[in-house]
Curated annotation (Swiss-Prot):
Identification of the protein by name: Nicotinamide-nucleotide adenylyltransferase
UniProt-recorded Gene Ontology molecular function terms: ATP binding; nicotinamide-nucleotide adenylyltransferase activity
Xref: PANTHER family: BIFUNCTIONAL NMN ADENYLYLTRANSFERASE_NUDIX HYDROLASE (PTHR21342:SF0), PHOSPHOPANTETHEINE ADENYLYLTRANSFERASE (PTHR21342)
First-tier enzyme category under EC: transferase
Keywords recorded for this protein, A-Z: ATP-binding, Cytoplasm, NAD, Nucleotide-binding, Nucleotidyltransferase, Pyridine nucleotide biosynthesis, Transferase
Species whose genome carries this gene: Pyrococcus abyssi (strain GE5 / Orsay)
Cellular component per GO, a single term: cytoplasm
Compartments (UniProt record): Cytoplasm
Membership in a protein family: Belongs to the archaeal NMN adenylyltransferase family.
């Protein structure tokens, strides 16, 4: 049995992810889907929680009709590239092949001896979570870029409103981050 690894942030899950997963599912018996930056949420780059991203994936995979077994595994960032692959190995079941469109991820796994399949990217110009988040904030159409089940879920959790609030509060948030930390005197 061949098990593949596919890692993404899925902020949000979009049709490009589903096309990539269609390719991955066609190549292996089981798929481990690693949810990167699992510790991050409620920021412009990572607006959705890990649980919300898992729900999006479950719904989108069901909608796509993929029948093979898959595992969803949260992968918090460690920000240390040299040990990232051993870290991933410790967090997921054994796998045989890695699917990625990210050149750094490909290099790191190749250096550890893994077979890496650089998967085709599908309409990267618009099928990008960054572009989808930008459209959500700007009030531009985004719904055609994500599976219907994900559109419904984002509406259920008021995800667009969350993003717009984050964008509106960005200036004050940035000022707070730049303010000096005051240590209380005793």
């Amino acid at each position: 049995m061949i098990r593949g690894l596919f890692v993404g942030r899925f902020q949000p899950v979009h049709k490009g992810h589903i096309k990539a997963l269609e390719f991955v599912f066609s190549q292996v018996d089981e798929v481990i889907i690693g949810i990167g930056s699992a510790q991050a949420s409620h920021t412009l780059k990572n607006p959705f929680t890990t649980g919300e991203r898992m729900e999006m994936l479950i719904r989108a995979i069901e909608e796509a009709g993929f029948k093979k077994r898959y595992y969803l595994v949260p992968l918090p960032d460690i920000n240390f590239n040299a040990i990232w692959v051993p870290y991933v190995e410790s967090m997921v079941p054994k796998f045989h092949v890695v699917f990625t469109g990210n050149s750094l991820v490909a290099q790191l796994f190749r250096e550890r001896g893994y077979k890496v399949v650089v998967q085709p990217m599908f309409r990267k110009d618009i099928l990008s979570a960054t572009e989808i988040r930008r459209r959500m904030i700007a009030g531009e159409p985004w719904e055609d870029l994500v599976p219907k089940s994900v559109v419904e879920y984002i509406k259920e959790i008021k995800g667009v409103e969350r993003l717009r609030n984050l964008a509106t509060n960005l200036e004050s948030s940035e000022k707070e981050l730049q303010a000096p930390i005051r240590i209380p005197e005793f």
